């Protein structure tokens, strides 16, 4: 029973590049939630749009890392719309962008561990 309630706490998400849905899911899976971005989409003047619909009572942190796990961007929110020109500068020379949602307990005094959900990996051109 604990396992199923833990899965429900994940919520659902969408990762959109230039109004094109790249990844949509509700189960964190680093092997399945992977998409290669076309060079034309990556070089355009559009947006990276990340939308997370939460389940449960947590504090949420959206995090972008490179392929080696180095944090490139982080914000306390469940959704973000970022200019691709800004993201291209952050990820210049990188091969992948990994997108995570960090779920922290709503009360710091709870001493519960944070959960990290892999929302998706974008393979960059």
Task: List where the protein language model places each region.
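Bacterial N-terminal signal peptides
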Residues: 1-4
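Terminal leader/tail segments of proteins
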Residues: 7-125
């Amino acid at each position: 029973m604990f396992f199923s309630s833990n899965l429900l706490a994940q919520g659902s998400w969408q990762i959109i590049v230039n109004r094109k849905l790249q990844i949509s899911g509700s189960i964190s899976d680093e092997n399945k939630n992977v998409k290669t971005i076309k060079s034309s989409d990556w070089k355009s003047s559009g947006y990276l749009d990340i939308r997370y619909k939460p389940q449960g009572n947590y504090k949420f942190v959206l995090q972008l890392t490179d392929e080696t796990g180095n944090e490139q961007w982080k914000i306390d929110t469940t959704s973000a719309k970022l200019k691709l020109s800004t993201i291209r500068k952050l990820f210049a020379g990188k091969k992948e962008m990994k997108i995570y949602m960090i779920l922290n307990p709503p009360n710091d005094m709870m001493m519960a561990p944070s959960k990290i959900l892999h929302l998706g990996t974008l393979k960059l051109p």
